[in-house]
Each structure stands twice: as structure tokens, then as C-alpha cells.
Amino acid sequence: MELLKQLYQIHSLSGFEKRMGKFIRRWIRKNVPDAICQTDKLGNIYVTRGKAEDYPCLASHIDQVQKTHSEDFVCIESKDIILGYSPRNRRQEGLGADDKNGVWIALKCLKEYECLKAVFFVGEEKGCIGSSAADLTFFEDCRFVVQSDRRGYKDLVTNIGWNELCSREFLADTEYEKFGYQPHDGMITDVGELKERGLAISCINLSCGYYEPHSDEEFTVKKDLLNCLALVRHIIENCTKIYPHINNSDCFDDEREYMHWEQYDEMSIIIDDILAKYPNVTAECLKEYYGIHYDMLTLEEFRQLLNEAKENIVEPGVLEEPIPFI
């Protein structure tokens, strides 16, 4: 787990990922010297190892949400979990395990497999900035793309909103059940952005063992991370053909409208719960915490939802602590 803890030690706030990118490139040069590593103008890193007609491909993102990362930040590792801590400030601090866990999996596999592609995106937490401008020709000889960027331990994301990510054949061939995974709908991430841009191969996003993401209470359960790595290895070794997939939606605009109102309704429930406990919360604060995953809602809609929810408050309270990420 030494490499994982080295990744956790690097603060890589969205928009300030250069240090992480430099670490990844140096690590690859030292540990996978035969790999070809290229970086685009945004900072996305594209890695190809070996020569083959087609490649398995892994994706991850190198930015994180947490703004606090003290100079004395350390990783505390127990038998089951890893968390971040500042001894001087006597407080827990976020690891950035979303998505350093995915970066770790990709680096481990690059070292292990002689023919593999991997891509490390910038700016995922700010709306998939890197993947929205990524070079799609990099994926032309890929069999599939697997991203490890989901909280928990059992989700295999096959749909993001109404955007299907993979073929049934690929899903079956992954044999995900052997590893305790289940198909699940997910939220915006890089493979979803690639599919929206027209990537015509199967993609999935896997739970990779981090919990309480985007918060200072974030932690990693090691056995869940290792189980994700085991599934990724299994897919690389057993899914040895190209798995084409095109999301043919004739009613995309209608689906997006439905998704928008679905997000609106979900956020209405969330704000009701939040406001009952934190009556001083602002629309700007809600947008900052939830806007990444409720990306179809505008700031004005957050204001509207907040005003509607205020009418339902029974007992006002006092905002004494940060809003927990849901």
C-alpha cells in the first residue's frame, strides 16, 4: 500500500493537478520504462504499454475536491481502513481517494500487464473538463474502458442517467457476480463524458473502496479496494476482444428533460432534510456541494428549491458544522 499512501500525500485540488501529473509520469518512467507516456495541453496523461492490435484500457482522474491538506498530513493505516490526519491540527483530513484509488489501480496494472492503455484525466470534479476535451483517437484500438471512480464496494455502473455505457455481452463477460458487484446507475464521470462524445466501445465505472467522498471524513476500506483491483485484473485477462457499443437514443432531448426534473425532485427532498437542520444554508453552498452530481440544476433552481423548502421548516436551528455530502 506504499504507492497508495504516496498518492494520498499529494494534494491535487481541481485546477492544480500538476504535482500529481508529475508524480505519475515519473513513477511510470521508473517502474514501467517501456511505456509511452504523453500529456496534452490540459494535463491529461495518455499511457500505452506494449504493441498490440487492441488494448484493454483503464481510466481515472487525478483531481480531488478537498481544499484542506495540512503540511503535516499523514495517512493512518489500520487493519481495515486508511484515513488522513493532521497531528498538529488534531483533525481528520480527506485523502482524495476519489479518485486516487482509481489512479493506484491503473498504475498497478500498468506495471503488471505488458499490453495495456491507461488515461489519467484532469478536472473531473469540475465537470469532466479533461475528458470533455480528450483525444478520442487514443481509444480507437481499445477493447473497452474501465474506470474505478465510484464510492462503496459493489456498484458496477452501466448507466449514467439515460446514457447506457456498455453492451450486455461485455457486462456478462466481466463475470462481476464472482466479485460481489451489481449493475447500478451512476452519476457523471469521465467514461460517461466519453460516451456522450460518441466513444463506440463499452465502458463501466466500478466502486473502488472509498467512502464519504468530497469530505474530510473520507476513508478507504482496503479489502474493498483490493477486490476492485481483482475484478479489474479479471476483466483485463478475460475480456480479450473488442466490445463495441453505441448508445442509440432517438429521444435524447426528452430523456435529458426527464433527468432534469428527476434531479430537481431528488434535490427538493435533500434540501428539505438539510434545511431542517441547517436553516442558514445558502443556495451557493448547496450548489457547491451538490452541483457536481446534480449537474443539470442551475444556481437559480437551487435558490428556488431553497425558498420552497423554507416554507416547510417547523423548528429553526443553527448552522454549526459543514453540510455532510450525500
Task: Annotate each PLM feature.
Residues L3-Q6, I10-E53:
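A non-catalytic alpha/beta surface segment that caps or lines the substrate-entry region
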Residues K30-T39, E77, I81, E177-P183:
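Short secondary-structure junctions
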Residues T48, A52-C115, E125:
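Active-site metal-coordination/substrate-binding segment of hydrolases
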Residues R91-E169, K178, P183, D190-V191:
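Acidic/histidine-rich catalytic neighborhood of metal-dependent amide-processing enzymes
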Residues Q182-C228:
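Zn-dependent metallopeptidase/amidohydrolase metal-coordination segment
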Residues E212-N280, N307-P324:
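His/Asp/Glu-rich mid-to-C-terminal helical/loop segments that flank catalytic regions of hydrolases
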Residues P279-E301:
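Acidic, low-complexity, intrinsically disordered interaction modules
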